[in-house]
Regions:
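Structural marker of alpha-solenoid helical repeat scaffolds
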Residues: 25, 59, 76, 93-97
């Protein structure tokens, strides 16, 4: 069993390295940044994930998928007010973009914190 876990760790590291290489080619690629941020979340590197999510949303506020993950990161770390702020921003952007599914996910998470 230990051998399998080690193999999974190698795959995760390889994935992170591949995503970093792709970002070197196009540092403003929000899709790749988002994917790398999710890998950081999985590995417990919340500061790196937070920076990437915030970079994406500063540059491209309409990249609505990142709001949920950034807010969840803050929520998980006990920063509820910051999580609420990001859920609210995300709901506003999702509504503006007509992203109803994303809006509903954000609203549901927001309501869990505020009601």
């Amino acid at each position: 069993m230990e051998e399998k876990r080690g193999a999974f760790k190698i795959v995760e590291v390889d994935r992170v390295e591949k995503l970093k290489e792709l970002l070197e080619q196009d540092p403003a690629d929000s899709f790749v940044q988002h994917a790398l941020a999710l890998e950081y979340v999985k590995s417990g590197d919340d500061p790196s994930a937070q920076k990437l999510f915030e970079d994406i949303l500063q540059r491209e506020p309409s990249y609505v998928g990142s709001y949920y993950h950034l807010a969840k990161l803050f929520e998980r770390n006990g920063n509820i007010q910051e999580a609420i702020k990001w859920y609210e921003k995300g709901m506003k952007e999702a509504k503006k973009a007509g992203e109803n599914h994303t809006y509903n996910e954000l609203r549901s998470a927001y309501e869990e914190l505020t009601f």
